[in-house]
């Protein structure tokens, strides 16, 4: 199985959040980002599939439903590599707190849930650096679907429709996201990922998040 070669020795702190769609992780990260900035911390945000180099190509292909599971893996690995080199590492060298909405664990969970070989996927990210903290916001696929459907219908790939699990996108969503959740659960102890109950209120989740983040930052010499 994939192992990070070593912890980074850069001045900054890398904090990542993970979870299935609808877990509320992005909301929590935004609140955390705004709070850290408000108390004078140097902080930068980066998210999955946002590299200027390739994200537009990936989004066009997704809209046309053209991506096989392995192609998905490759495109996201290229995107990640570019952001790691151009955004994450420079910010860490400068002493910033880097907040990442999804990290390599997203690929490890989603791609394997799509049937891609686990060792192959992990091998794509052999260059990744180990985060200082990874938080996993845990919620059931059913609750996730309920939250998403309050605003929109499930998207083609997040519902796993490319896998032909069911002709019904709602049923397919639950099946696929359950698979993704199962992969995340396998990784918790393996990668020392901290689980947060995402069924709690937004305020309670943020309180849990800040308490953990404060401890990690204190270990890096940052007292909040």
For the regions a language model picked out, list residue spans one by one:
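Extreme N-terminal, non-catalytic leader segments
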Residues: 1-14
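Hydrophobic anchor at the beta1->P-loop junction of P-loop NTPases
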Residues: 17
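Walker A (P-loop) phosphate-binding loop of P-loop NTPases
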Residues: 22
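Conserved lysine of the Walker
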Residues: 25
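Hydrophobic positions on the alpha1 helix immediately C-terminal to the Walker A/P-loop
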Residues: 28
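ATP-dependent small-molecule kinase phosphotransfer cores
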Residues: 35-129
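Conserved nucleotide-binding/hydrolysis micro-motifs of P-loop NTPases
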Residues: 50-52, 104-105, 139-145, 202
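A glycine- and Lys/Arg-enriched "phosphate-lid" helix/loop adjacent to the NTP-binding pocket
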Residues: 107-180
């Amino acid at each position: 199985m994939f192992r990070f070669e070593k912890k980074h020795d850069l001045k900054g702190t890398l904090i990542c959040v993970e979870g299935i769609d609808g877990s509320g992780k992005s909301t929590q990260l935004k609140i955390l980002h705004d709070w850290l900035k408000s108390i004078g911390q140097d902080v930068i945000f980066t998210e999955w599939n946002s590299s200027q180099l390739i994200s537009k190509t990936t989004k066009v292909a997704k809209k046309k439903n053209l991506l096989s599971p392995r192609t998905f893996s490759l495109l996201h690995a290229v995107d990640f590599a570019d952001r790691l080199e151009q955004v994450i590492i420079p910010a860490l060298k400068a002493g910033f707190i880097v907040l990442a909405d999804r990290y390599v664990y997203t690929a490890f969970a989603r791609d394997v849930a799509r049937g891609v070989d686990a060792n192959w996927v992990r091998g794509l990210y052999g260059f990744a650096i180990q985060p200082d903290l990874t938080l996993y916001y845990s919620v059931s696929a059913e609750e996730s679907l309920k939250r998403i459907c309050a605003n929109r219908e499930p998207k083609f790939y997040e519902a796993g429709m490319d896998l032909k699990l069911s002709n019904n996108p709602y049923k397919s969503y639950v099946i696929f996201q359950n698979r993704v959740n199962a992969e995340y659960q396998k990784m918790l102890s393996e990668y020392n990922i901290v689980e947060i109950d995402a069924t709690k209120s937004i305020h309670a989740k943020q309180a849990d998040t800040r308490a953990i983040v404060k401890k990690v930052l204190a270990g890096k010499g940052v007292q909040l």
